[in-house]
Swiss-Prot record:
Gene3D superfamilies: Urease, beta subunit. This is Urease subunit beta. It is found in: Cytoplasm. Keywords: Cytoplasm, Hydrolase. It comes from Cupriavidus metallidurans (strain ATCC 43123 / DSM 2839 / NBRC 102507 / CH34). The keyword Cell membrane does not apply.
Length: 101
């Protein structure tokens, strides 16, 4: 093995297989683009994003790690969210939870 070498498996890899998901429609009501990263607690995103926040509590974007989704001003789009895993304790972000979900 060479340091940093990748040895991918043959075939398709399904991200977040078997994890609970929800779909929400998000509108950017602000005048600036908003970008949300793959592991950001979606419930706590920028206030300019209008969507069902309670449905998003405990969820993040269902996208590959290290990627993001950008919402342009005035844009509306539907995104799939996946449940946060592990102990489901959230600290930081915008400070709206600061503990167990």
């Amino acid at each position: 093995m060479i340091p940093g070498e990748l040895m991918p498996l043959d075939g398709e890899i399904e991200l977040n297989a078997g994890r609970p998901t929800v779909t929400v429609t998000v509108a950017n009501t602000g005048d600036r683009p908003v970008q949300v990263g793959s592991h950001f607690h979606f419930y706590e995103t920028n206030a300019a994003l209008s969507f069902d926040r309670e449905a998003a509590r405990g969820y993040r974007l269902d996208i590959a790690a290290g990627t993001a989704v950008r919402f342009e001003p005035g844009q509306s789009r539907t995104v799939q969210l996946v449940a946060l895993d592990g102990d489901r304790i959230v600290y930081g972000f915008n400070g709206r939870i600061m503990g167990a979900l």
